[in-house]
Every structure is written in C-alpha cells, then in structure tokens.
Amino acid sequence: MTRTRPQDRTQPPQTDPIRALLASPPDLPVVEVLPELRERLSPDPSASDDAGAGACLVLTAPPGTGKTTLVPPLLADVLTDVRADAPQRAPGRVVVTQPRRIAARAAARRLADLLGEEVGGTVGYAVRGERRAGPDTRIEVVTAGLLLRRLQRDPELSGVDAVILDEVHERSLDSDLLLALLTDARAALREDLTLVAMSATLDADRLRRILGGSSEGSSGVAPLVEVPGRLHPLEEVWAPPGHTGRLGPRGVPREFLTHVAATVERALTERSGDVLVFLPGAREVDDVVSRLRGAAPEGVDVLPLHGRLPASAQDAALAPSPAGRRRVVVSTNVAESSLTVPGVRVVVDSTLAREPRLDVARSMSGLVTVGVSRAAGVQRAGRAGREGPGVVYRCCSTTDWARSPLAPTPEILSADLTGAALELAVWGVPDGAGLAWVDEPPAAALAAAREALERLGLAGADGVTPLGRAVAGLPAGVREARALLATAPVLGARRAARATALLTADLRAPGGDLTALARQVRGGGAGSGAWKAEARRLEQACRRAALEQPGDPEAPDFASGGPQAPDTGRGREETGSPDAVGEGTRAHDLESAVALVAGTAQPQWIARRRGPAPQAGKEAHYASVAGTGLRLPAGSALAESEWLAVAGVDLTSGRGDALIRAAAPLAEQAALELAGAWLTEEERTVWEGGRLRTERLRRLGAITLTTTPGPPPGPTAVAEAVVARVRAEGADAGLAALPWDEEALGLRARLALLHEHLGEPWPDMSDAALAERAEEWLAPAVTSLAGQAGGANGANGPGGSASGQGSRRFNLERLDVAQALRALLPWPQASRLDELVPERIEVPSGSQVRVDYTAAIGGAAGATGSVDPAEAGRAGRPVLAVRVQECFGWAATPRIVEGRVAVLLHLLSPARRPVAVTDDLSSFWEQGYPQVRAEMRGRYPKHAWPEDPWNAPATRGTGRRR
C-alpha cells in the first residue's frame, strides 16, 4: 500500500541518538536478543507494497529486562533503514502503549535520559490532559485509551509506522480492545503497520495467532522472541496478620493496615536496601504512609506512589535514593510491572489488589478489593531481585497464597463494558463479531452495555448516534462525558467542565463528599492543580463538541421553562453573559453543579437515606433507584442529606451495601427530575392477616416515595393477590393455604397418576407445576368467588365483610378447589377421566367402593394437598379398602389406567381393620385366606368364613357361618 504524506520530515542527523544508544546499550538482559529482534522486525521485502509489509511479533520478557527501554529505539532504527530504501516516504513514528499515565511518562523520561535529551524531542509522550511531543519525535509513549481514540479518528493511523503494545499481560480493557481494533485495521487498511505485543507473564500462543492473522489472507502465527531474566535469589517471608483478616465485610480493615506498617518496620530492621510496599489503593497507601512517617527510623524517607499524585511526587518516588538515605516507597499496583523503582531490595506485599467488577445482581459497577493472583504476586516479589539478592514479605498465610487464583481476571471478563460497547459501535461492529479477541467479551455483559447505550441515546438499531460519536471523542468515561454535554447548555461549558472534572480527575472526596472536594480544590487545597488542568481540558473538548453536535434530545429537559437546572438544594450564583454553549444568566455554583452532573451521569445511583440520620461517627445507609444498597463512610458529613447523587462506589466482595466514594447532596425535586425515567405509580394488593388491602405507590425506581390507601380490591385484584401469595410463600406452603377437601385431594391424586403413566396432555400435579399454572386454574375460581356478593362482601357471613379503607376480607375457605382443578382437564380426554381412574369400583357384593388415590402419592398430599413431585405416582398405588366377605368369588385384581396400574386391595375384617394387603387375589385365596379364616372365624362368628371362597357368594352384611 502506497501512502503519501502532507510533507516530508527531515532525515535523521548524522549523529543519530537512537543509533548511538543501540551501539552502546545499557547492560540489560534484552540486549541478548536485539540481533534476533532486528531480523524479525525487518519488513518482508517480497510484499507488493513499496516499503514491504510490516512485521508482527510477540516478545515475552520478565519485568526489569529492558524491553520497554530498548525495543522501541531498535524498532525506530529498523524503520529508519526501511524508509531509507524508500525515500519517497518519510519515516513514521513508533507509538508505544502503557497501561497507565504514570508508566507512560516514566518510560518516556527514562528513554529520553538514555538518549541525552529532554522529553519532547526524539522521545515524547501523550497522556490524558498532557502531551510532550514535537515534529522530531520518533518514539511516542501513550496510554492505550489515548491511542484508541486516535485510532477511532484515523483508522489508518497516519504518520505511525509501528505500534508496540507493552504490558499486555495486564489485560486492561483498553488494551484488549485496542489489540482487536488494531489487528482489524491492519488487515483492512495498513498491512505495512508493524505490531509488537510485549508481555511479562501472558501465555503467548493466543497473541501469536491473533497477530499472525492480522494480514489479509494470513492464517499463520507471529514469531515469538523470549528474553531471559536475570533475577537474583529471592527469599520469601510469610507474615500473616494473625487473627486479623486481610479483608473484612467492608473492605480492608484498619487493623490490617497497622499490620502492614509493622511488617515494613520489621523489614527495615532486618534487611538493607530500599523497601517497596504494595497496597490495593490510594486510600490504603496514604494511610500506611502516614503511619510510617511517624515511626520510620532516622535516614529513611517514606514516599507514596499512585496515580492521584502530581507528576512531581511520582517522579520523586521513582528517583534513586540520595546517598546515605533509604527509601520506603508505598505504592498501588502501578509499580507491579510497568515502572522501575531503583534501589529496591525488599518488597512488602499486602497481597491485595483492587480490580473493576460488574455486579450484575446489584446492577452496579465499581472497584472491589480482592486477593492478588499468584502471577501478580510473583511480579511484585521480583522487584526485590533485580539489583541483587532480595526478600519479599507476604502479608498472608501460605494457605491463603495457595488459594489465590493463578492469574488476575481480565477486565473484559469482569468489568462494565459500556465504554467498550460504544467504541465498538463507533468502529462499526456493535457486537464485536469478526474481531480477534484474546478473550471475547461476555455476551450478557455486552448486551447489557448495548442496552445502556440505547437508554443514554448514544447508540440504537442503526448504530452509533451523533451524540454517541461526540461522547466517544471526549476524554472521559461514557456517562461522565454524556453528563458534560447534557448539562453544559444549563450550567455553561466552564461550570459543567469544572463539575465534571471533580468526577474524572481521580481525586479522593473526603468522606465521599464531592461538595467538600469542590471546596478543597476551589480553595487551592490538595488536588487543585490536577482539577484545574482536567477542567480546562474538558471545557475545551466540550466547546469543540458543541460546535459539531446539536443538543442531546434524550437529555433531561432542564431548560423547558428557561435556562434553569433542577434545584439541587444548594445556593446559586450569578454568571456572566451566555457563552458559546448557552450559559444561562443564573446557574448553580460548583457545589450545586457537581450534584447536577453526578445525577445526570448516574441517575440509577440517585439514593435516599434509609431512616433518620445516624449518630455521629456511624454509617448512613441508602437505597438507590436501581435497588442497590449503599453506605457512606462512617462520619461522613453527607449523612445529614436525605437524598444523594452518587457518582462512584466501591463494591464489597460479599453481598453487603456498596461503599459510596463520591456523592453530592440533592434535593428531592432534583432527584425526581434527574431520575424521572424511573418515576412510576402503581397499585398493589397485599395480605394483612386475613384481609386484602390495596395500596397506591409512587416510586422512583426501587425507592417508594409515598404509599396511600386505594379502593377495595376488585375480583381480579383478589385473584392476582391469591396467586401471588401462593408463589411468594413457596409452592408447597402457598398451596397448603388453600382449602383442600377430600374431593380436591382425590381429583389431584387421580390426575397425578394419569400424568405419571400417560404423560401429556394430562396435567402435572406437582406443587411447582400447579403454582406455575395458577393463572389458569386458581385465578378464575377466585375471581368468580370474589365476584359473588356473599363470597367477598357479605356483612357478617362466611364470605367475610368489607371494612377498613382500601381493604376487604376474603375467605379462602369458600373456594371449591376441586372445581378449580377441573380447569386443567384436557379436552377431549376429560371425558375418559372416570374410565381411566374411576372414583369407585364395583366389587362382587355389588357395593360401589371408593378408591383412595391419595395413597398413590405416598400420602404426600395429606391434609394440605401438597405433593412431592419426586414421589408422585411412585411411592404407592391406589388403594381399594373392602371387607373380605364382599370379595368372595373375585379372582382377578382390578386394574386401572388402561390396565397399567393394579389397584392395591386392603382386605378388611368386619370391624374394618386390615387383615391382608394384596394386588394378587388369586394367590391370596390360595395361600393367605386359610390363615385369615382360622384367625377371624372365632372372633367374628356371625360373618361368613367359607372354606371355599372361590364359590361362596359375596355378601355385604352378616351371613350364616359355613
């Protein structure tokens, strides 16, 4: 494929810093494979393209082997040679992706330092809100998410000759999605694009197949280059927390953080060198840092390292220790594989990690703290063995370690896929079909994400909407970006951007209170610099989008009565003249604006407090519109607020309430407007003792706003309530509430026997089946009974009485259950019911004796009619209880159900007590009867006990002794 460029770049100078670095590289293990890499990465000269087809390659290398440092310059040098053979084309850039912003900046600085340059020259970087690159940049380090947006804007990646996907073993959602789209673009548009995937631990086979198949018509596998590691001996020390667990029902216990800090102090005493501590999140990092700074020995510096810190603080943590001093670097998993922390000889691992999760049952997505995988734990430990013998202190037991998963769960299998679904819709493959995935996105999670996009007005049956395309182009999450565009016409672009930045700048809200965070950053406190930079970036993006995208027709109509947003319950301030996106003359201050933006971003998380405000220092619990339980951190100032707009949560590993990590107070009216799509009114009929009561409920999703009495329930409502009660109490208990008389029990047993032996269309009589089909047989009977004046509204009769507003008494005892069951009889087979399972059988005496069919179901029906489906038709047989004298001369045992079932005869004494049980009369007369006769003739001398029962006449009463 031949491409033309707007202008040619200047050829590299005579003294090429990249070539100089490769001529004298640092002593790193990757140097051993550089010749092989150069050979593998040289494009195929046999390709039709004038520069040859781009290479694809998978590189596996342990952390610390130098792959991020030396592979990008090697590839840039290879491409320079290629372009020298094709002078009509200027060399393009090598773009290197990193999973995190901090890693991208650090990698670029490290490489630029080796080249003897400042960042922004030969080597640059670009992350969200910051870019240092220029026209001479040949290697650019970016985050996967940023390259994903570039690829969506320009699928050909103009000006890029190679992409290196670094740390792909971390399996971030952006990284997996980027790999799928890059291979798709390469196959269709850019066969000359070189792709390299670099991994520390991932099984490379799947990657090799994906990259090997990214050329049109190719079905091979990409070559694999393995870099040997040079880890020094590593000692393991197990430091479990004793009786204190690593995880409690509400996250990481403070007692465990105390244990981690104590383990660090122990390591400082027992070992030499710097200490690297791994904790699951920024909150835990700051907690342990504060503990250690007050207890660390003289000459020890304690430094935090996480993504929320300013770049200067991150750089300080990554710098070598000053002479004569030791460092303790307390980090999240950012230092796990993609960063180099020099001087580390000791690792203290909390063995915990924080990962994104989609909780389908609770309709929530958020971060959850889990035990670290063994693969990640090994990587953490390896940080101690790069410069010499090291040691890892693991804050768990060997049993816990053995139970740890082998590898972390890929985000694509566990996280919310709404953002990924929007990217796929913009790419033109909403279902992801045809893309090469390391792991395909789960169908259910992707379907839920696509439904969410439709609700947000970002995608539909015809693909991505203009609004969805605008949202995808904004440097923020899907919901936050949409909230920015939706609220800008009301708040103004600047105020909306400032409020949205409180949600997206990765700042910690004190006590989960976004309004407190707003006051903090507005007053120049912690995080103010990051917030201002984020706000400026969002404002610029919002104004660009406003010029290209008309208003969102799906957004809440806040401005229907003028440029007023819902009253969130906070104060207002005057604004200047309207700006380009329609800033009104009155709008909320920052504290009110963040409530509006948060409620617009996550309306399903708007929540109302359960009960009164808690006592000081206690947790407040809330119920959300989506029905999920939420809780504030203990002592949060937000606990006084009845309503909250919740923007972020941390999930617990159990089923407890999710922890609110970002929220703002909200007035009830604002909550109703922001979550108006969930506002409903309904009537329901409920049981209260023996009385049925109708309620009118006004609800905001799962939140009940008001409950008022309704009119007395009509017959249909009564029937629905009875059916609901049967199901709600469980099939067996619910059916037991019905008045099962002998006729109903018998009919049910007869039908159960037919279903067992003849199958369909004879109905299943099990508890579960009857409950499932209750609308067919039970509801009509209840409706009919409730419609009878005496059956439901009689003043004092057995049907009950109507009394109390919105209620009526309904007496189930009047229900004819047998008649109700007949509604299930199949037609025309119903006419054969008495033939197949007769109620009575005529015996030789002429008596019509009732058959006991309940015995055929093992007596399980009992007095309640409850049938165990596992026993139905198998625990016994129908019983015919008849006196011996009425059966004289009867040779053949009666059979029913087309001869399939023999009736079990209970032969009775004159006192109607069983003297024999048989289903073989012939054998009984020959073998059993003589003994019965011998025992009974003296006890009942007035009754016939003939020696020859075959020929004796059957009799109902007493007879002369024979």
Place the predicted regions along the sequence by residue.
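P-loop NTPase motor module signature
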Residues: 1-479, 483, 553-557, 561-562, ...
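Short conserved micro-motifs at the rims of enzyme active sites and ligand-binding pockets
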Residues: 152-153, 246, 359, 404-406, ...
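Short, isolated positions in well-ordered beta-strands
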Residues: 232, 630, 848-850
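Core structural elements
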Residues: 280-287, 389, 414-423, 441-479, ...
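Acidic, serine/threonine- and proline-rich low-complexity intrinsically disordered segments
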Residues: 459, 494-621, 626-629, 642-840, ...
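Short, surface-exposed, low-complexity cationic segments
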Residues: 635-657, 855-896, 903, 907
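Short, surface-exposed polybasic-aromatic patches that bind anionic ligands, especially phosphate groups
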Residues: 841, 845-851, 913
